[in-house]
């Protein structure tokens, strides 16, 4: 077999994809523009450079990303192997010496007999089997090519994502199901507020701490939609005419209109996750939790993904990608990493792992590899290709809400997560036997 796969981008996803291909005997051109052309966020020419935190987050199996890491260990992940080798003390988290980590990944790939490294910028999608893993700072010229491949309006340039919460953690006695003016089916959960409750919420919001904005993100920051805390700064009642507007949302129990309403919209096909409508935000995560828990019905809510607003480049995956990260209608072109709508270091690497294995299988005339939805790696691939809210698709990190529910409901959260983790690893072990 002489055909070569092009992997564009040697970040976490591209590095993982190249390794998975090479380990299966497939020849790879790993194309990385650094150091020929640097990005505003990178500082070295190393592969898999961690540009923000040096933490890959929780390592325990009661943590969703911990389960994802363990699945990836079982699948011979280069990124997780590098992280384990470069680990530094960080309590229950897997944090790394970023130089040792990137150095290990770089040397492994540069010394692999099946990988050729090409340091050059490309402005068009290569012919033949290709995995695009160019990340949130994809160059404008390549982004235009991606638009050509995926279709108009399928590529986004920034995140403006509202928090996502677990349905099981909502106090259903305090909320009601209703659509504004009863139009269509009752699709939203509504959290009603009295005037006093709204004022308490508003005052806390005005005191809440905002996250700093990176220099390279400022240019794109306010395109499109505004953080709800910025909207609130315009006046105490501004939110009442925006995302917290109560008109047409009378409480069916009392027949009265609340002073304010926070709406929750289903976010996944299984109905286990809801997003807070219009609450795209740049508040720090701790501040988000404090403010959100002032909303009636959400006092004990579990937040599976916090709201974000930052520079990003990602495609509308549910419309254009399959569960193997392949572009629909163009069977030699795959995507991986943050560009696909996964959020986080580990999640990006996991998408590269799935894409890499699938391209290798296709070239070796083997079947598609679609991991079970009971696994974290499989549930993420399913989410990006089947998200319910595809018209407003936003990136997602690993969380237990993505997994199919247990046959028997378990009320205790820690025990439930343990059972989900155990089931995920069992399913993965069984599925591995078929590969």
UniProtKB/Swiss-Prot annotation:
PROSITE patterns registered for this protein in UniProt: GIDA_2 (PS01281)
Location(s) in or outside the cell: Cytoplasm
Domain of life: Bacteria
Major location category of this protein: cytoplasm
Pfam families reported for this sequence: GIDA
EC number: 2.1.1.74
Binding, FAD: 9-14
GO cellular component: cytosol
Protein name: Methylenetetrahydrofolate--tRNA-(uracil-5-)-methyltransferase TrmFO
